[in-house]
Curated annotation (Swiss-Prot):
GO terms for biological process: cell division; filamentous growth; G1/S transition of mitotic cell cycle; meiotic nuclear division; negative regulation of ascospore formation; positive regulation of G2/M transition of mitotic cell cycle; positive regulation of mitotic sister chromatid biorientation; regulation of mitotic cell cycle. Gene3D superfamilies: Cyclin-like. SMART domains: CYCLIN, Cyclin_C. It comes from Candida albicans (strain SC5314 / ATCC MYA-2876). The gene is CLB2. The keyword Cell cycle applies. Disruption phenotype: Impairs macrophage killing during infection. 2/mitotic-specific cyclin essential for the control of the cell cycle at the G2/M (mitosis) transition. G2/M cyclins accumulate steadily during G2 and are abruptly destroyed at mitosis. Degradation is necessary for the cell to exit from mitosis. Plays a role in morphogenesis by negatively regulating polarized growth. Through binding to CDC28 regulates cytokinesis, partly by phosphorylation of the actomyosin ring component IQG1. Also involved in the phosphorylation of CDC6 and CDC54. This is G2/mitotic-specific cyclin CLB2. Residues 208-334 form the Cyclin N-terminal domain. Pfam families: Cyclin_C (PF02984), Cyclin_N (PF00134).
Length: 492
């Protein structure tokens, strides 16, 4: 009988586990299989004496790599880590950050239909005290980390009265509503009218959809100060972690929406939970695994994610971490993705490919750099589009259509975010994998182009927010003024 060969589908994407090889501990999977007891002994040996990391070049010569990888950061701080249990696969204490944010609210009395106006019968003091204690325990608020259970009501009329939300006064508008309540002092065109025949563009509902996004984005933001509240986590560790996450996202060829959602889920989780240093890689893997299932049509298997971690975690551990992470976040993944705002503002830019490609690179800066944590995605998209048009030399850089389709952002609103992006471009390269990704030809070598432009712009001493380059109209008021600006830029 002919022999049937079985194919191993563990590595469907033909991934290489890592460019970095540990000479002492990591061996080829095809030749050796390590038992659980031996794996624990080798892990303890790696903690006591971390192996040297070397990179083998194409010529066969090994060089010592000075780059600080994720495993090096874990080994450096692993002495402070505590053993984890099954209930907390990502480690950490008893959620001290969560106890600070989620305090039990005051008990809310539930109205009943029997209003006897003081005609109830008197009872003993002990029975009243017992009933009061029972009511207090029943009315305590459930922490938001757990799925909320539906409470029964005695009457449907009371439920309708409770669900009635009073309309806010004119002076009590929320912060997310301020862009819509401004006086429209700029010119803009209705570009959605062109898509009235296309049912996929839903032009009749697009304004309502993005109004909902603007209100939702403030609720889905992580705590901007969580890195400084964590006892072991440092900003440098998050930078290495997100850079590794970008590399895994590129290997799997996932959508940009999956990367943005994964970083948002990871930041929101660490805003309320303390994560051990040796579990950071597991958290990032579980976050991308969850985001891919939410955004992608065909998501990679969990075995591929576990394989990419270089055998550090098993598929069962990734699934267990995913369950725990979603429980803490109350299964809330309704995150207004920044790519939606970027596509919306690209309509006012005539869907220019160059502007949108540079905008995607500048937008991903906001997730790899910790300084942008807590900024609204719509603000980051508007700032990325402004800087992309400035790099390409488009005039006017910001006009009435861009103000309207960005959500009402003026240059004064974007000043802080644009300056942070510019400071990242002129600073030394910190995220290697992120820089290599956008140095490819299919991304128009955006990382190299933007950095070279930033250095020349800084040397020229020009102003990022030159009022002559922007207008509240559709075009610059005077054509001669536009020609003068172009000639001045050419001379510089």
């Amino acid at each position: 009988m002919p022999q049937v060969t079985k194919t191993n589908n563990e590595n469907e994407f033909r991934l290489t586990r890592s460019k970095v090889q540990h000479q002492e501990s990591i061996s080829t999977i095809k030749n050796t299989t390590i038992s659980n007891s031996q794996h624990k002994q080798q892990t303890q040996q790696q903690i006591s004496s971390p192996p040297q990391v070397s990179v083998t070049s194409s010529e066969g010569v090994s060089h010592v790599n000075t780059r600080q990888y994720l495993g090096d950061v874990s080994n450096q701080y692993i002495t402070n880590a505590k053993p984890t249990n099954k209930r907390k696969p990502l480690g950490g204490d008893n959620a001290p950050l969560q106890k600070q944010q989620h305090r039990p609210s005051r008990p809310i009395p539930i109205a009943s239909d029997n209003n006897n106006n003081g005609s109830t019968s008197s009872s003993s003091n002990s029975s009243n005290n017992n009933n009061n204690d029972a009511n207090r325990l029943a009315s305590l608020a459930v922490p938001s980390r757990l799925p909320q259970k539906r409470q029964a009501t005695e009457s449907s009329t009371n439920l309708v009265e409770k669900l009635r939300v009073p309309q806010p006064e004119v002076g009590e508008r929320s912060q997310s509503y301020h862009k819509k309540s401004r006086l429209i002092d700029y010119e803009w065109q209705d570009l959605d009218e062109e898509d009235s025949d296309d049912q996929l563009m839903v032009s009749e509902y697009v304004n309502e959809i993005f109004s909902y996004y603007y209100e939702l984005e403030t609720r889905m933001l992580p705590d901007p100060q969580y890195l400084f509240k964590q006892t072991l986590l440092k900003p440098r560790m998050r930078s290495i972690l997100v850079d590794w996450l970008v590399e895994m996202h590129l290997k799997f060829k996932l959508l940009p929406e999956s990367l943005f959602l994964a970083v948002n889920v990871m930041d929101r989780f660490m805003s309320v939970e303390v994560v051990q240093i040796d579990k950071l890689q597991l958290l990032a893997t579980a976050a991308l695994f969850t985001a891919a299932k939410y955004e992608e049509v065909f998501s990679p298997s969990v075995k591929n994610y576990a394989y990419f971690t270089d055998g550090s975690y098993t598929p069962e551990e990734v699934v267990q971490a995913e369950k725990y992470m979603l429980t803490i976040l109350n299964f809330d993944l309704n995150y207004p993705n920044p790519m939606n705002f970027l596509r919306r503002i690209s309509k006012a830019d005539d869907y220019d490919v160059q502007s949108r490609t540079l905008g995607k690179y500048l937008l991903e800066i906001t997730i790899v750099d910790y300084k942008f944590i807590g900024m609204r995605p719509s603000l980051c998209c508007a700032s990325a589009m402004y800087l992309a048009r400035l790099i390409l030399g488009k005039l006017p850089v910001w006009n009435g259509n861009l103000i309207h389709y960005s959500g009402g952002y003026r240059i004064s609103d974007m000043r802080e975010c644009i300056e942070l992006m510019f400071q990242y471009l002129i600073a030394p390269i910190e995220h290697d994998e992120f820089f290599k990704k956008y140095a490819m030809r299919k991304f128009m070598r955006a990382s190299t182009l933007c950095r070279n432009w930033a250095k020349k712009f800084q040397a020229s001493g020009r102003d990022l927010f030159d009022e002559r380059l922007s207008t509240h109209r559709l075009t610059l008021e005077d054509d001669d003024e536009e020609e003068e600006i172009v000639v001045a830029e050419a001379e510089e």
